[in-house]
């Protein structure tokens, strides 16, 4: 039967990609359906109970800057917050939060249920309705048909999901959830390149069976950081510590002697796992010279004894898992609540997508999250927000949008995926961004919120807060620029006493702040300025201290932007361009880049080939002008 009303956008899947996609579409005023196999698992953290980290927090704050839910849900559920790389420069600093799994999920569900224009329905999706290479809707497990001209598929690990524990395996989307095998079969009928990837999770431990006295305590930071630009520390629940222990020679011996029982090393698993989050058996095999590996003992929440031992993800048989866990200091008597496992699943080559995350071959069909070959909640959420936004823009008859590499880590993520593809689960790092001094986590709102408002993603409350912050930064910069300190005056002497730097002549406070030894808080203390919003103070200090470097990056971006944004015609035939080698013609035909900048990042496409493309475009443009004037 057909559902009685029609939707404009349908989102399949209620994980981190699906929730952000559905919320983005609905925030833009588009009638949106979120289809999930189980309402109780909306926003569920399938793996580790943490949000953020190096490169990842930048994505979380960009999602937040565009009105998304992830950062706010983290502030309301975070039970430990830390800033990583705190002693390094602002470009690589990253906020990481340990979350209470149950609270996080409850917050996400509450946000979803209170979002106007969003309907939620519990049913698995078994089929897509496709007519003349255009998606028209979906069919659920019970045969119910929903119609919409845009569908966002965020299937996570559910497409053809196969769970492995030792040499035993069974179908599943994750532990306790069924796979989406009917949909996986339907997807394989479409003209899209499909592959298999793998990820894994460690056994969960009962905290009552662990001896924390022999472990190293790892408390959170003070003052407690926040994740959302709209958040504050008062939102956080009770804060707790994590703990650190290590594997040892005995642990490694147990693993090495049982590799023949590992599905990874016996050839049972075909999919490639995440390079930067390897299983413990992978670590022992690849880093045989290391005597030990860190294990972070992370609490799963405030109302459970379950612990997540980050660092020992494994798919070895249960008896071996028990031996491994009990060989680690502090866990000699540990009770395993849930065994670790690996899961294989289908993903689709992201080179078959446009920048909007719409597939090139099926109009209106968008992919987001692990289906595109990524790993991580943050990467999924970022793609979900972008896909949901573009599905809504399509419904509204507006042009699609994707930030450039110099505008957002979301832009870096998407450009990497659709240009280079991936043969292993893709994880974001700050090192992937060429312009990371500009793309800091602290200025995500200044980079993206204005665009979010234009797109319809930002509500009035967030917009008012953003405008107040932006005006506050301009006002404080102007005050520092126009306030002068002279040698021999009480203020001048206070500056000398505070920082130990003599004043040769008069300086503006902005000039003084640019000095490496001068910090904003100390300068205000010495000169008697008023205490301002910490977010404003942070921006003023970073912009002043790194002004020269930031200006140079902006100049470089401006130089490259002209050719970067030059669009390549949809109907361009690369085989007719003289001078291009057959190999490069083949690469360009396969990838079908949208811009000259994207073409330049395809492996094997040389600068000389880009010059030939530019010449071809100029000739083509001149030829069309002559035709029009004739």
Swiss-Prot record:
* UniProt keyword annotations, A-Z: Cytoplasm, FAD, Flavoprotein, NAD, tRNA processing
One annotated Gene Ontology cellular component of this protein: cytosol
Q: What does this protein do?
A: NAD-binding protein involved in the addition of a carboxymethylaminomethyl (cmnm) group at the wobble position (U34) of certain tRNAs, forming tRNA-cmnm(5)s(2)U34.
Q: Name one Pfam family in it.
A: GIDA
Q: Would I find Flavoprotein among this entry's keywords? A: yes
Q: Which SUPFAM superfamilies match?
A: FAD/NAD(P)-binding domain (SSF51905)
Required co-factors: FAD
Residues that coordinate or bind FAD: 13-18
Gene Ontology molecular function, alphabetical: flavin adenine dinucleotide binding
Q: What are the GO BP annotations of this UniProt entry?
A: tRNA methylation; tRNA wobble uridine modification
**Similarity-based family:** Belongs to the MnmG family.
Name of encoding gene: mnmG
Q: How does it assemble?
A: Homodimer. Heterotetramer of two MnmE and two MnmG subunits.
Gene3D superfamilies from the UniProt entry: FAD/NAD(P)-binding domain, GidA associated domain, C-terminal subdomain, tRNA uridine 5-carboxymethylaminomethyl modification enzyme MnmG/GidA
Q: What is this protein called?
A: tRNA uridine 5-carboxymethylaminomethyl modification enzyme MnmG
Which residues are listed for NAD(+) binding in this entry? 273-287
């Amino acid at each position: 039967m057909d559902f009685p009303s029609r939707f404009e956008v349908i989102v399949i899947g209620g994980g981190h990609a699906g929730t952000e996609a559905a919320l983005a579409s609905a925030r833009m005023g588009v009638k949106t359906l979120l289809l999930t196999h189980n309402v109780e698992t909306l926003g569920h953290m399938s793996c580790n109970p943490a949000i953020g980290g190096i490169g990842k927090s930048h994505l979380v704050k960009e999602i937040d800057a565009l009105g998304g839910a992830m950062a706010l849900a983290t502030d309301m559920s975070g039970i430990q917050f830390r800033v990583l790389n705190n002693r390094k420069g602002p470009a690589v600093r990253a906020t990481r939060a340990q979350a209470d799994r149950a609270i996080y999920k409850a917050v996400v569900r509450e946000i979803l249920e209170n979002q106007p224009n969003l309907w939620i329905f519990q049913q698995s999706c078994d089929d897509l309705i496709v007519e003349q290479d255009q998606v028209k809707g979906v069919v659920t497990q019970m045969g119910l048909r929903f119609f919409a001209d845009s569908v966002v598929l965020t299937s996570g690990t559910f497409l053809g999901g196969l769970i492995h524990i030792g040499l035993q395996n069974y179908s599943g989307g994750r532990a306790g959830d069924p796979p989406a095998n009917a949909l996986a079969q339907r997807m394989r009928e479409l003209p899209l390149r499909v592959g298999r990837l793998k990820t894994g999770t460690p056994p969960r431990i009962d905290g009552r069976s662990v001896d924390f006295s022999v472990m190293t305590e790892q408390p959170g930071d003070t003052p407690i950081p926040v994740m959302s630009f709209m958040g504050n520390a008062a939102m956080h629940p009770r804060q707790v510590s994590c703990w650190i222990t290590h594997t040892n020679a005995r642990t490694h011996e147990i693993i090495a002697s049982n590799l023949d029982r590992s599905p990874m090393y016996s050839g049972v698993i075909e999919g490639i796992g995440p390079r930067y989050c390897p299983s413990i058996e992978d670590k022992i095999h690849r880093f045989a010279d290391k005597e030990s590996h860190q294990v972070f003992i992370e609490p799963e929440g405030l109302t459970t004894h379950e612990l997540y031992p980050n660092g020992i993800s494994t798919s070895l048989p249960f008896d071996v898992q028990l031996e491994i866990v009990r060989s680690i200091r502090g866990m000699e008597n540990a009770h395993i609540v849930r065994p670790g496992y690996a899961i294989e699943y289908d993903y689709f080559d992201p080179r078959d997508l446009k920048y909007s995350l719409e597939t090139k071959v099926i109009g209106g069909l968008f992919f987001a999250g692990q289906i595109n070959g990524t790993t991580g909640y943050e990467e999924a959420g970022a793609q979900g927000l972008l896909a949901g936004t573009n599905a809504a823009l399509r419904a509204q008859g507006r042009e699609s949008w994707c930030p450039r590499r110099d505008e957002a880590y979301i832009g870096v993520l998407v450009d990497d995926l659709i240009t280079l593809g991936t043969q292993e689960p893709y994880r974001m790092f700050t090192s992937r961004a060429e312009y990371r001094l500009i793309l800091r986590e602290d200025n995500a709102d200044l980079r993206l919120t204005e665009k979010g408002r234009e797109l319809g993603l930002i509500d009035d409350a967030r917009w008012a807060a953003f405008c107040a912050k932006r005006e506050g930064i301009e006002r404080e910069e102007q005050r520092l620029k126009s306030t002068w300190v002279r040698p021999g005056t009480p203020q001048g002497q206070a500056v000398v006493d505070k920082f130990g730097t003599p004043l040769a002549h008069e300086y503006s406070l902005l000039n003084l702040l640019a000095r490496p030894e001068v910090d904003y808080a100390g300068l205000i203390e010495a000169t008697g300025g008023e205490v301002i919003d910490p977010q404003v103070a942070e921006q003023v200090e970073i912009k002043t201290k790194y002004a020269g470097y930031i200006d140079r990056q902006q100049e470089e971006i401006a130089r490259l932007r002209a050719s970067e944004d030059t669009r390549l015609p949809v109907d361009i035939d690369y085989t007719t361009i003289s001078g291009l080698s057959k190999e490069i013609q083949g690469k360009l035909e396969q990838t079908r880049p949208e811009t000259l900048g994207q073409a330049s990042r395809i492996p094997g496409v040389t600068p000389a080939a880009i010059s030939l493309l530019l010449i071809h475009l100029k000739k083509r443009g001149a030829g069309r002008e002559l035709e029009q004037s004739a």
